[in-house]
Regions:
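Long amphipathic alpha-helical segments
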Residues: 1-52
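Conserved mid-sequence domains
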Residues: 34-141
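Short internal beta-strands
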Residues: 143-145
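Peripheral docking tails and interdomain loops at the edges
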Residues: 147-176
Length: 176
């Protein structure tokens, strides 16, 4: 467990930052970035599927990415971290409409809902998304992190909380 965690934090995430810079500066093709990202994604999924822990925590967390968001690596890593710490996990994946998210939240009744927003499409309206989530998911705390939350200057709507760093997210979700 700790080996995967260290590998992602010390090697993979810094490597992905460099890949992002190469992509932004036109030094690699988007297909190359997709290839690397999908190889890492596969490894994270295998790690999630094979994680074994003697710790059992009687709390559940639901992971999702909103419509227009397809960058799963941060969310998959958080899924891995919390599953390895004994939390029950429900992973919906990428591109989930808010109405579908609300349906699953009502069906599964998780203790917390979490999403990490990396790079949504240009059509994504963050404020509209926040309001929809706040209106449709009541009684279950929603935690959001990622670049969009760091640049948002207003107070999030009721029921939604922003976390600014990976460490903040881990500490908060592990203590819920």
């Amino acid at each position: 467990t700790k080996g995967m965690e260290r590998t992602v934090l010390q090697i993979i995430f810094p490597f992905l930052e460099k890949i992002g810079i190469l992509w932004l500066t036109g030094h690699i093709n988007p297909a190359q970035e997709h290839l690397v990202t999908n190889l890492i994604r596969q490894k994270l999924i295998v790690a999630i599927d094979t994680v074994h822990t003697s710790i059992k925590v009687d709390r559940s967390i639901l992971f999702f990415l909103p419509e227009g968001e397809h960058h799963e690596l941060g969310l998959l890593f958080m899924h891995y971290l919390l599953k390895s710490r004994g939390l029950q996990t429900i992973y919906l994946g990428a591109n989930v409409p808010v109405k579908d998210l609300a349906y699953i939240v009502n069906l599964k009744n998780p203790d917390i809902v979490y999403s990490h927003l990396t790079a949504t499409t240009s059509a994504f309206q963050f404020e509209k998304f926040l309001n929809q989530v706040s209106q449709q998911i009541t009684g279950t705390p929603v935690i959001l992190s990622g670049l969009l939350t760091q640049h948002y200057k207003k107070t999030p709507p009721t029921g939604i909380e922003f976390k600014k760093s990976l460490q903040e997210v881990i500490e908060h979700l592990a203590s819920v």
